[in-house]
Amino acid sequence: MGCCTSKVNADPVSTVLVIGPESAGKTTLLRCVGRRCAGADESEPVRTMPTIGQEVEYLSAPGARVMLQEIGGCLAPTWPRYYDRAAAVLFVVDAAAPETWAEALVLLEELVGAVRDKPIGVVLNKLDAAAADGAAARGLLGLEELAVDVFEGSLTGRGALVDDLRAFALAARPLSIK
């Protein structure tokens, strides 16, 4: 299978935008996907700081290269500037922080309204936290009514989610340059 890489090669690059409210776990997910793809030790905890700006992780597989581009939650007003260049979007929500769901709902509705022709994935993150309520988050965010893929994640970013996100990202096709 493919791995993460920072080498330049001839395969076209797809961009998957990774966004969501502050402290939802976007950077942890990016780093865990990167570790898994690189075959690195996943037992060490992922250390992160709030993203001011962006974080980038590259994935590759035969015939495909993907740039996972996280734009920090504090930059939500700028997210629409990135939609045209993205082949797909991942929206990360902290399922253990119900106080953030109203903001997440507004941001998700704006995203779905603006991005109609590209795959959107929603990650309900931190479901292994004591305060997590995935069913309530799904209901409030209206995920059953939206045309989105839903993924479930943990505090550590470990588990099947990493492989699911990698598959979602690698399925994104590069946009043709106009």
Features from the language model and the residues they span:
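TRAFAC-class small GTPase G-domain
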Residues: 2-175
